[in-house]
Curated annotation (Swiss-Prot):
The keyword Hydrolase applies. This is D-aminoacyl-tRNA deacylase. Keywords: Cytoplasm, Hydrolase, RNA-binding, tRNA-binding. Homodimer. GO terms for cellular component: cytoplasm. Its EC number is 3.1.1.96.
Length: 145
């Protein structure tokens, strides 16, 4: 499982010009699920993200978590995060989990975040989406589990 975590001032995801998810200040999560991922990875990722202190306090130190700042999450499924680029010029996605299992696991991940008291908006699994965001920092972390 790979999650790209971006601290944002705001973010939105659109499909065919219609906004399907948007947040003010918070985290944009780009979520890639690999073959072999399961509940263990989903729970660990949700725990880590819910507790991660990546927002600045009054002194400018990254001491605050998403709940401390009243932030929200926009979760977007992105299988291309599992691209293998070692050979040739065309990325291979053989390590990415296939639907419908990947769709179900992504939904479970989002529910685990909600269970931890977070407000979660989402894109639409498998759709061609346009993601708009304003990075804060920028502050981006890649979480591999």
């Amino acid at each position: 499982m790979r999650v790209v975590i971006q601290r944002v001032n705001h973010a939105a995801v659109r499909i065919d010009g219609e906004t399907v998810g948007q947040i003010p200040k918070g985290l944009l999560l780009l979520v890639g699920l690999a073959e072999g991922d399961g509940e263990e990875q989903v729970v660990k990722a949700a725990d880590k993200i819910a507790k991660m202190r990546i927002f600045e306090d009054e002194a400018g130190k990254t001491n605050l978590g998403i709940k401390d700042v009243g932030g929200q999450i926009l979760s977007v499924s992105q299988f291309t995060l599992l691209a293998d680029t070692k050979r040739g010029n065309r990325p291979s996605f053989v390590h990415a989990m296939r639907p419908p299992k990947s769709s179900q696991l992504w939904e479970e991940f989002n529910q685990e975040l909600v269970k931890r008291g977070l407000t979660v908006e989402t894109g639409e699994f498998g759709a061609d989406m346009k993601v708009e965001l304003e990075n804060d920092g920028p502050f981006t972390i890649v979480l591999d589990l």
